[in-house]
UniProtKB/Swiss-Prot annotation:
Gene, per the UniProt record: AQP2
Motif NPA 2 mapped to chain: 217-219
Full protein name: Aquaporin-2
Name of a matching Pfam family: MIP
Keyword Membrane: yes
Organism: Milnesium tardigradum
Membrane protein topology class: Multi-pass membrane protein
Glycan attachment sites: 143, 292
Length: 323
């Protein structure tokens, strides 16, 4: 047996034994893995910045975050569209583009992926942490390392300013994302979509990260914050700013995503001619997958699950959605 045949036999065995039939569960698995990749790269870049005394280097952080998002979108883009962000998923559900059941399941997967990625980075840099802080975990200060995992606001930032910061940044994020996935707009081709999203994150970080790090993603902030609490950083991970900060990246991001979705629909989406408002503005990628899966079951199509990504792109022309 040749090597190539051996590989095919191994892949066929793996598919037979472990392929998941539920499209929803497949989506959750993809979101989990993609967010894990996103957070490992994002937190890894933050760790490198802190250990090399580049804590305030916005360009370093911005390009690291942008490239992390690009890689993560490539991971799950063909399966779910790569939401990667509970706030984005909620916004798409509000617009009727993602079933609420899928939204909630994806959110759980995203938080789990972010938490386990935080554990992975802690293990990866455990020795470096001990050298840097002498084994005494600190949240803030010269030897503080909690910013590897979560965002913390500048001392001058008020609670009101922090909330506006998160709403404004996430609204801009979703406005541009919706423009990229709108069939009637100048959306990038699927293969270039992750690059475009990465560039969006770069410019958002450069322009808006000074106040509080531009979290713009609840799973990117809350799950790692929970991890740092468990890992020995103490209650200061939540008590910073008198307990007026830790919930802002969660609530503000969700609010901002919904605001941004409404703004895009008002100024762009609702302005297309009525003839152009076809199913591209009302159907989600996952709902299309589910319809195809049901049809395949009725027709007893044995090979339906072998290449759902290619079927998704060629038959439906839908691009990935993010983030």
């Amino acid at each position: 047996m040749c090597i190539s045949e051996g590989k095919m036999d191994w892949r066929s065995w793996l598919r037979k034994k472990f392929q998941v039939r539920s499209q929803l569960l497949r989506g959750c698995m993809a979101e989990f893995l993609a967010v894990f990749v996103l957070m490992v790269f994002t937190e890894g870049c933050s760790a490198s910045a802190i250990f090399t005394h580049r804590r305030n280097d916005l360009l370093f952080a911005a390009f690291g975050s942008g490239l992390a998002v690009t890689m993560a979108v490539y991971v799950a883009g063909g399966v779910t569209g790569a939401f990667l962000n509970p706030a984005i998923a909620v916004a798409f559900s509000v617009l009727g583009k993602l079933p609420w059941k899928n939204c909630f399941c994806y959110m759980i997967a995203q938080y789990l992926g972010a938490f386990l990625a935080s554990l992975a980075i802690y293990a990866q840099y455990y020795d470096a942490l001990n050298i840097f802080d002498g084994g005494h975990r600190q949240v803030l200060g010269d030897n503080g390392t909690a910013q590897i995992w979560s965002t913390y606001p500048q001392a001058f930032l008020s609670p009101q300013g922090a909330f506006v910061d998160q709403v404004f940044g996430t609204a801009l994020l979703i406005i541009v994302v919706l423009s990229m996935v709108d069939k009637k707009n100048w959306k990038p081709q699927n293969g270039y979509f992750p690059i475009a999203i990465g560039l969006l994150i770069v410019v958002l970080d450069i322009s808006l990260a000074y106040n509080a790090g531009a979290a713009l993603n609840p799973s990117r902030d809350l799950a790692p914050r929970l991890f740092t609490y468990v890992a020995g950083y103490g209650t200061e991970t939540f008590s910073v700013k008198g307990y007026t900060w830790f919930f802002v990246p969660v609530v503000g991001s969700h609010a901002g995503a919904i605001v941004g979705a409404v703004i895009y629909q008002l100024f762009i989406g609702a302005q297309w001619p009525q003839d152009d408002l076809d199913d591209s503005n009302s159907v989600s990628s996952m709902s299309i997958h589910e319809k195809n899966f049901s049809l395949a079951k009725r027709k007893n199509t044995r090979n339906f699950n072998l290449d759902i990504t290619r079927d998704f792109k060629e038959r439906n022309g839908i691009s990935t959605v993010l983030y």
